[in-house]
């Protein structure tokens, strides 16, 4: 399973708008991705309610993971989005 540990770059954490940006990007990745606190259970990264339920604050670490064969590119892009607190997925049209 491919995995990336990243620090959340959005000051407000994975709440409201940043969570929506992240969920859209996870859905658009085309691979099943999970997100979790380092010591917590993973949740579906494409589920807004699940992501909000994590209660992740800015500056906290999360673990992105996927067992898909082609997960590395998707995880790298999502990790960049989360760590840099971007408003959209890098390379999005």
Give each language-model segment a name.
Residues 20-23, 79:
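Predominant activation on well-ordered alpha-helical scaffold segments within soluble catalytic domains
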Residues 4, 44-46, 76:
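Hydrophobic alpha-helical context, especially transmembrane and signal-peptide helices
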